[in-house]
Design a protein with these regions (language model features):
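Extracytoplasmic copper-binding redox domains, predominantly the cupredoxin/blue-copper superfamily
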Residues: 24-225
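C-terminal segment of classical bacterial N-terminal signal peptides
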Residues: 15-23
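Bacterial N-terminal signal peptides that target proteins for export
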Residues: 1-9
Length: 225
C-alpha cells in the first residue's frame, strides 16, 4: 500500500514540475480549511500533515530546512520544500547515523557521521523522497519536494492557512507519511479573496523498509547504538 500511495503522490507532484506555468503577478488569495485525520482503526489522530497546492511554479527561497537526528528519530519526520532548496541533517545523538534515500527524485547516501556533524543535500527535482538511517531501522522521514512555496504544515487541530496563492483553479493536496491513500480537491482562488476547503485523510501503520543495499536490516542492529 505504501508504494501505491507514494507513486500517486509522486505523480501528483512531478506532473506539474515541468509543465506548470509561473505564478501570476496579480495579488494572490488565501486558502483556509481543516484536514480531518483518522487512523485506519477509526480513531481520530493528531496532525502531522502537509497541505500544498500544485499547478504553478515558483523560485525557491534561500532557507534550508532541517531534519534533526535525535533519540534515534528524525525530527520532524515530514517536511516540505520547494524545488532546488536544501535540507540539513544534524546529528544530535552520541552515536553514528547514516542518512540515505533510494527514492527516484533524489537518491543519495550521506555516509556515517557522528554527533555534532551536519550534512546537507539539495533537491533539484519535484517528488516524494523517503529518508532512512542505514544503522537504525526505526528511523524514517519524508521530504516533499514541491514546485512552489504554497505549502504548510497543518496545526495540531488540522487547521491550515495558505497565503498568497495565485488566482486560478488549482489542485490542493493533504499528505501524511502513513496515509492509506492520498487526498485532494479542486480549489478556485480569486485575487484578494479567501477560499475554504476541507480535506480528510486516513493513516495506517508505519511500513517496513530495506536498508541502503536493498536488504533487510540485521536483527542485531542494536550493536550500533
Amino acid at each position: 500500500m505504501r508504494a501505491v500511495v507514494k507513486a500517486a503522490a509522486l505523480a501528483a507532484v512531478a506532473s506539474v514540475g515541468s509543465l506548470a506555468a509561473p505564478a501570476a503577478a496579480e495579488p494572490g488569495g488565501r486558502v483556509v480549511g481543516t484536514v480531518k485525520i483518522t487512523e485506519a482503526d477509526g480513531q481520530p489522530a493528531a496532525a502531522d500533515v502537509i497541505v500544498y497546492i500544485t499547478g504553478f511554479n515558483e523560485p525557491p527561497s534561500d532557507k534550508v530546512a532541517t531534519i534533526s537526528q535525535k533519540g534515534r528519530k528524525f525530527v520532524p519526520d515530514l517536511v516540505a520544500i520547494t524545488v532546488n532548496e536544501k535540507v540539513a541533517f544534524p546529528n544530535f545523538d552520541p552515536f553514528l547515523h547514516n542518512v540515505f534515500s533510494q527514492s527516484l527524485p533524489r537518491k543519495f547516501d550521506l555516509g556515517s557521521f557522528p554527533k555534532g556533524e551536519t550534512k546537507q543535500k539539495d533537491f533539484p527535482l519535484p517528488g516524494v523522497v523517503d529518508v532512512y538511517c542505514n544503522i537504525h531501522p526505526e528511523m524514517a522521514a519524508t521530504i516533499l519536494v514541491l514546485p512552489n512555496r504554497r505549502h504548510t504544515l497543518a496545526g495540531p487541530d488540522g487547521k491550515f492557512v495558505l497565503e498568497g496563492v495565485p488566482p486560478g483553479e488549482w489542485n490542493i493536496f493533504a499528505y501524511s507519511r502513513r496515509a492509506t491513500k492520498p487526498t485532494s480537491a479542486k480549489v478556485t482562488v480569486k485575487a484578494g479573496g479567501e477560499t475554504t476547503v476541507d480535506l480528510a485523510i486516513v493513516r495506517g501503520a508505519e511500513p517496513a523498509h530495506l536498508n541502503k543495499y536493498g536488504e533487510k536490516y540485521k536483527d542485531n542492529v542494536q550493536v550500533y547504538k
